[in-house]
Amino acid sequence: WTSDAYPADSVSLRSISSDNFVVVDTTGKTKAIAEVDFSSALATLHPKAIYICEGEQYFVEKLEYEQRKAYVKKTDVDYFTDAIDYTKIKILDVFNKKNLAKCAISHGEVHVETQVVGFKKIKFYTMENVGSGDLSLPQNEMHTTSYWLTIPSEIFHSLPFSSEEKINGLFGVAYVLHHVAPLFMMCDIHDVGVSIGDNSTGKSVPPRDIPVKVLDEKEEPAFYDVAFEPNIFIYDHFPGGIGLSPSLFDLEKELLEQCLKTIMACPCQEGCPSCVGPTRESGRGAKQVAMEILKNLL
């Protein structure tokens, strides 16, 4: 190689995008201590976040979005922060679609809009929610590829549970899909995202803990409408996609069967992080309803 340039310098092993955020420590002498990739920055470096680097805790005092810099100061607290984001997905193109026993699976191109709208303070060891806050940050938009599962409206509405329990079960299915799918794709759970939408209207279902003032009633799907037909999306967390979601489409029933086995094998009563998610997040009846949804689809 005779050029003065070194090709490997322009290729990151950690991130597709080179548009990283620099973390600046202002505790003593100002210095840069880390870089965070663009897709993770708003969730980990938002104002009032606790950023952990090399075992040290840092409080994020200011995030300069345009300059791609976050200013932090050392701290010592007994909690960590967890960002609350709201993801909206719009289907742009369907590459493949097939019907399974009682549901449909698809693979295609989607437009993803993600906005960090708040954060929770979670206490170490006990995992108690000890506080929260609202945030107003720019949206992160990208085109990527996605796999999605469509649950027929007649199956969803015929379940013998209350509307609240059915929605809880839907979130439970999304949770277990998000955690089981990476085992088949041989990737990290953070390499893919999950979202729930309405196949009949194209609207997205907001997470349960989203601040009320962020919601727009015109954008919310009508859960109680008989036309509401849930889509559960598992999408590549990288612009353009990196080939993860097509492998889920090829699995057909195997993915759903493994999700059902995972829930049934878990000894908990109402739900836990090993199956449909913590009870406080998944809601009442989530485990039982999630099992019924999967059984009906298979």
Predicted regions and their residues:
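Extended, highly charged accessory segments
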Residues: 1-45, 49-55, 62-298
